[in-house]
Regions:
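Metalloprotease/metallohydrolase-associated module, dominated by Zn2+-dependent proteases
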Residues: 102-152
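Short pre-active-site segment immediately N-terminal to the catalytic Zn-binding motif
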Residues: 56-84
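Extracellular/periplasmic catalytic domains that process cell-envelope and extracellular macromolecules
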Residues: 41-45
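Short, aliphatic-rich beta-strand segments
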Residues: 48-53
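Catalytic Zn2+-binding segment of zinc metalloproteases
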Residues: 87-104
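Acidic helix-start/capping segments at beta-turn-to-alpha-helix junctions
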Residues: 30-38, 104-111
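Zn2+-dependent metallopeptidase catalytic core
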Residues: 6-27
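Soluble non-cytosolic domains of exported or imported proteins
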Residues: 8, 74-83, 123-128
Length: 152
């Protein structure tokens, strides 16, 4: 899986918990071809996260690691890490019997994510779960805690 090179230690720990919970992680499935704007999916019935590495690379202008400036690599990494974390929030929600996670009500979604929230809601039909995923994708330590609480 190519996307691993873009991750930090906390995302590797998140993957371990997700896999312990019985989920698999795949890369660049046919779902990614729906649109280059999609960076990840959770296929609930198959217990599978899909990371659209190629879409993230195209979106950020990444071609290859040896011929790249650090800024493009970092932007691509952020895109992939957030996609993994976002889908991992949905895993935690599934581990919580499909319910929202208990988080501080004062946490709010970054306004820059409103368009993405609309797109995700259109696919999943679950606005509050998507809102929570967009909030927690920026909080990897809190996400890890929630995965441990609900999935292990």
């Amino acid at each position: 899986m190519e996307f691993i090179v873009f991750l930090d230690r906390i995302e590797i720990e998140i993957i371990r918990i997700v896999e312990e919970a019985g989920y698999s992680i795949k890369e660049n499935s046919s779902l990614c071809l729906l649109s280059e704007k999609y960076a990840g999916f959770l296929i609930k019935k198959d217990k599978k996260i899909v990371i659209c590495t190629d879409n993230a690379k195209k979106r950020e202008g990444y071609t290859n690691r040896s011929n790249q400036n650090i800024d493009i690599f970092e932007r691509t990494a952020i895109h992939i890490k957030k996609a993994l974390r976002h889908e991992a929030v949905h895993v935690a929600q599934e581990c919580n019997n499909g319910n929202l996670l208990e988080i501080n009500k004062k946490l709010s979604i970054n306004k820059a994510k409103f368009d993405a929230l609309r797109g995700s809601k259109d696919i999943s039909g679950e606005e509050e779960k998507e809102r929570q995923a967009y909030i927690l994708e920026d909080k990897p330590k809190l996400l890890k805690e929630k995965l441990e609480k609900y999935c292990l």
